[in-house]
Amino acid sequence: MVESATPADRRALGEAIRKTVPRTSHAAWSPPGDRADPVALLTEQDTDRLQWLVPIRHSRMAESAFTFYRGAAKIMATDLAGTPSTGLSAQICGDAHLSNFGSFASPEREQIFDINDFDETLPGPWEWDLKRLATSFVLAGRDNNVGDNDIREMTASAVVGYQQAMARFTTMTTLDAWYAHLTLQQITDAMPKKKDRAAVEKSAAKSRSKGSLRALGKLAEKVDGTFRIKSQPPLLVPLRDLPSEGNPDELGRVAERSFAQYKGTLDDNRRVLIDKYRIVDIAVKVVGVGSVGTRCFIALLEGNDDTDPLFLQVKEATASVLETGLPRSAYSHHGQRVVEGQRLMQAASDIFLGWSAGDQGRTFYWRQLYDMKGSVDVSKMSARRLKVYATLCGWTLAHAHARSGDPFAISGYLG
């Protein structure tokens, strides 16, 4: 963005880009003759993962076209690198499919709806995120046996929701646009049907119950008077039970060093808070689809006593799949890349976000495991509800891009 340009100038810039990159140029895609082998791209990702978890990744991706898509961010990033680009950049998610949106607690304890996965985040073309979001609705609709007309409508709802939200942000002050956010209460109030309002309220109530104390009962058990994370291989495996990852005591020491580094990345006030806790156990925990096989841990921390738990997730951060077609991150530490990107894109972020290094040059980021986190079961959504959800996702993605990009130029291009 040119700082001296007026809003009218910036909007005109977006409109002018239509002449060189027509909006219709985004409508079609066909694989080039030299397209990278999709299977080879997935296999390449597998080489540095925990090999005993790779089959789980493959089985989860094989469940349906949509679940394959969830794990295929690298394939799509490689394909998008050869598509027309507006040249308008923003901090982008890199994996903005519909299941990477959800609810969680803001630091002010509001339940808000936002993007919740930033493993691939990098500055890049805003339209890449929008294309990944729109395509995810096509595939989810097909998996749900939704008709073609409804699929077109829900996909259009995502794009129009983005377009209208971006236009709306140009009418706000800079600060108002920055602070804009969607709460579950706002979403509930906006639902036109009573049964839809009831569904959101039920989901919100379920999410409110998700915290570290509930997770303690689900993920841990008392052993000799002390809570320890349960062993539920292969999806949940404490360090003490890892099959081939080295000496458990040494792994524990690495974890403690990593924890100390992580605390050093927090703001002073939050470091004071985390210093009130100590780690009592750590385990490998399988999460998601595309992330399966990366080194993802959960740490059980204890505050005043064993009725005062805190669960943190410690997730390996590797190079963004977007680096296939974009410059490398300005951050050499990929954990920091994820955290800084998340803070820039989200309306409100987890107070415990931070990063650290492990052994062998690996990088990680830390966040709360459960803090009123909620998500929708897309497989059970009707076409009508998918359309509503698509509009919410479109608004949310537009807001994430407007925070770092130029809403006037993007809105000018979209019209």
Residue ranges and their predicted role:
Residues 3, 8-11:
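Basic, amphipathic N-terminal segments
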Residues 185-255:
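Long, low-complexity segments enriched in small/aliphatic residues
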Residues 1-4, 143:
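Short intrinsically disordered, low-complexity coil segments enriched in acidic
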Residues 10-16, 20-23, 33, 37-93, ...:
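Conserved ATP-binding subdomain of kinase catalytic cores across diverse folds
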